[in-house]
Amino acid sequence: MATNAKPIYQRILLKLSGEALQGAEGFGIDASVLDRMAQEVKELVELGIQVGVVIGGGNLFRGTGLAKAGMNRVVGDHMGMLATVMNGLAMRDALHRAYVNARLMSAIPLNGVCDNYSWAEAISLLRNNRVVIFAAGTGNPFFTTDSAACLRGIEIEAEAVLKATKVDGIFSADPVKHPDATLYDQLSYQDVLEKELKVMDLAAFTLARDHNLPIRVFNMNKPGALRRVVMGDKEGTLITK
């Protein structure tokens, strides 16, 4: 039951984890999951919401894992950035097949594959109701795609970062290990730090906090959850000042 007739956001940054794209496969990209996500993004565009997207790469590659095995962390992170580009290409294709205009921008130059990231161009595209997918993280090693999501969210002046996860929001403890854990409806940045809740890495989180960028954590696997978030319904956990 919608509480608002109109969306509460005009421009958002949607953060999708790479794992979200793998579905039940455990690796790679599940085409049915990809198409469902494209349809959910299409709904937002049809509501008049301007959508930026940052996708992780964990379904294809994780730099930190190989760094522990001895690989140079910078090399591993560069490989991780390329994984996000592969996911971005898949998402752009899924959006195009759903008749949604989308542009893929990479923080590292990949001529002939996708556009280079340009802040001015991204803003112009968003204003023209194009979905803009930001790939390759921040373009720098040692920074997560959550950091990229907050950075791009601030740059494009998004009203919130919507972090799509596999759980219903932020809990007082791991809901898998502790079934009686409490789901938080709303938290302040300070609450998250004091309770040491795992929302995103500290660099990403403090960036959002310092720029008063609200973060909404919700379950992307719940049908219609994304729409409910943008319509202002009770869904997931909101973090603000």
Curated annotation (Swiss-Prot):
Source superkingdom: Bacteria
Subcellular location per the Swiss-Prot or TrEMBL entry: Cytoplasm
Assigned keywords, A-Z: Allosteric enzyme, ATP-binding, Cytoplasm, Kinase, Nucleotide-binding, Pyrimidine biosynthesis, Transferase
Pathway participation: Pyrimidine metabolism; CTP biosynthesis via de novo pathway; UDP from UMP (UMPK route): step 1/1
Major localization class: cytoplasm
Residues that, per the record, bind ATP: K15, L16, S17, G18, G58, R62, T165, F171, D174
GO cellular component: cytosol
GO biological process: one example: 'de novo' CTP biosynthetic process
EC number: 2.7.4.22
Residues that hold UMP according to the record: G57, D77, T138, G139, N140, P141, F142, F143, T144, T145
SUPFAM superfamilies assigned to the protein according to its UniProt record, in alphabetical order: Carbamate kinase-like
Top enzyme category: transferase
Regulation: Allosterically activated by GTP. Inhibited by UTP.
Quaternary data: Homohexamer.
Function summary: Catalyzes the reversible phosphorylation of UMP to UDP.
UniProt protein name: Uridylate kinase
Species per Swiss-Prot/TrEMBL record: Sodalis glossinidius (strain morsitans)
Protein encoded by which gene: pyrH
